[in-house]
Amino acid sequence: MTKTMLITGASRGIGAATARLAAQRGWDVAVNYARNAAAAEAVVADVRKAGRKAVAIQADVGKPDAVARLFKTFDAEFGRLDGFVNNAGILDKAAKFVDMDAARLQRILDVNTVGAFVAAQEAARRMSTRLGGKGGVIVNMSSAAAKLGGANEAIDYALSKGAIDTMTIGMAKELASEGIRVNAVRPGMIDTDIQRDTGIPDRVQRAVPLIPMLRGGTAEEVADAVLWLMSDQSSYCTGLLLDVTGGRGL
């Protein structure tokens, strides 16, 4: 039976790469996006070219009501949920810790932490064998910033991703007996559009001297890690925080 996957924030970057690779691996894919419908539809077109079903679903993950609608739309389009990639996230302009205001922090937490929490709840309710589901796999998108701290640029973002690590471990312990594996991927400096959101166009290149492999990563390399965690090859892995960093942070 064909498996189905829902990916939040899948119109660009890691989410889009994951959707395309999932299709190549035989998954039907729901492509969530917040604003860029054209980009989401381009990803949908690529999934369909691979011979898989795909639907774009608009929802701002930073709004709990929108998350609920997202999953209801998924139910109507696909039915059973087998894999959930909790990927949607935002990153603000680089700033010093003392210059970050509460409104900025709240925006980041609404999407990266609260939104991810609510979305993971919705996925778990559908997968849990205790609640009548058939089990499944959840991959939360964390960041190397969760352990590196984001100093001088993005402490608020790092804080939001540290919470994802904690949530992943707690979920893994609680949901294992209900047929759900929960893991996280922690990307390092990956060359995607979100890096430009900091206002530092060469952010990845500036970090290269700090990376043992002496290069930034690609969205496709992160997608490979996500799909491994989704596969039976990782069937005995839960609660894993998988670094995809080129060795940065060792």
Name what the model sees in each region.
Residues 80, 176, 181, 237-239:
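Short, small/polar-rich loop/turn modules that mediate ligand/substrate recognition or access, typified
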Residues 94, 148, 209, 227, ...:
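Short C-terminal tail/terminal secondary-structure segment
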Residues 95-97, 101-107, 207:
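Substrate-binding pocket helix/loop in short-chain dehydrogenase/reductase
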Residues 120, 160:
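Active-site helix of classical SDR
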Residues 125, 129, 173-174, 235:
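Alpha-helical segment proximal to the catalytic Tyr-Lys
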Residues 143:
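Residue(s) in the substrate-gating loop at a strand-loop-helix junction
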